[in-house]
Amino acid sequence: MSTFSLKIIRIGITLLVVLLAVIAIFKVWAFYTESPWTRDAKFTADVVAIAPDVSGLITDVPVKDNQLVQKGQILFVIDQPRYQQALAEAEADVAYYQTLAAEKQRESGRRQRLGIQAMSQEEIDQSNNVLQTVRHQLAKAVAVRDLAKLDLERTTVRAPAEGWVTNLNVHAGEFINRGATAVALVKKDTFYILAYLEETKLEGVKPGHRAEITPLGSNRILHGTVDSISAGVTNSSSSADSKGLATIDNNLEWVRLAQRVPVKIRLDSEDQQHSYPAGTTATVVITGSTDRDPNQASPIVKLMHRLREFG
């Protein structure tokens, strides 16, 4: 074989290797940038902000921060003697007006029986008016008593659901105002994932598609199902000025950043029992209508999936 032929073969092999490398790089780039996945995903859960409905001194806090509590379990207690005294006073008012109403009822009935032969019509009407006034006062006293009873019941703040108390920032002896958040309750078995997918990766993603969730720093893979895709996000390029006219930011036409859209993913029931707090980060891969079988994937595909954790 001549020297010229060997050069042609070497050049052909080199070009073929370069072409294969370009194709491989393009495939990897397309797989990495266009397939529906994101490293910007967060564990999320239903959180209840616990705030008292009454004001007063906190007398007891029988729970600890980050403790798992049951529904109805006492979280903290507010100054009960003060509200017990208010209820006793309200009950005394009710008893007083009940007695007064009964007395005025007898007096009005007696005057009605005697009639205008024994007294004037004006006196009869006045007696009826006094009776109606006392009845209204009794109704008001009953309402005040019921409210005092409700306030006393709400001096004991209980967990509205099973979950973990967190960010407990109240202690016995402190004064707390009505409506002031005292602790957050992370409800158990309500965890889900919010995956912020780029808009270029949303095509083909539908509710019901399966998803793989890999927590940051872990090799464990959780599974879930796409629940919904957000119907809208804030338009950061547009706002209104003081006169209501639209203000549009200037953008470079050749640089367009893809907007991220929240995709809600329900965790499978068996994966609800995990140790990852709400707010922690995860990588999410949408696998389509079925779960991906890791045993059938080629080493290159496995490497690509693993590279997502680092890129």
Curated annotation (Swiss-Prot):
It comes from the Bacteria. The keyword Transmembrane applies. The chain crosses the membrane at residues 11-31. SUPFAM superfamilies: HlyD-like secretion proteins. It is a single-pass membrane protein. Pfam families: CusB_dom_1 (PF00529), HlyD_D23 (PF16576). GO terms for molecular function: transmembrane transporter activity. The keyword Cell division does not apply. One of its GO terms (cellular component) is plasma membrane. It is found in: Cell inner membrane. Belongs to the membrane fusion protein (MFP) (TC 8.A.1) family. Forms an efflux pump with AaeB. This is p-hydroxybenzoic acid efflux pump subunit AaeA. It comes from Yersinia enterocolitica serotype O:8 / biotype 1B (strain NCTC 13174 / 8081).
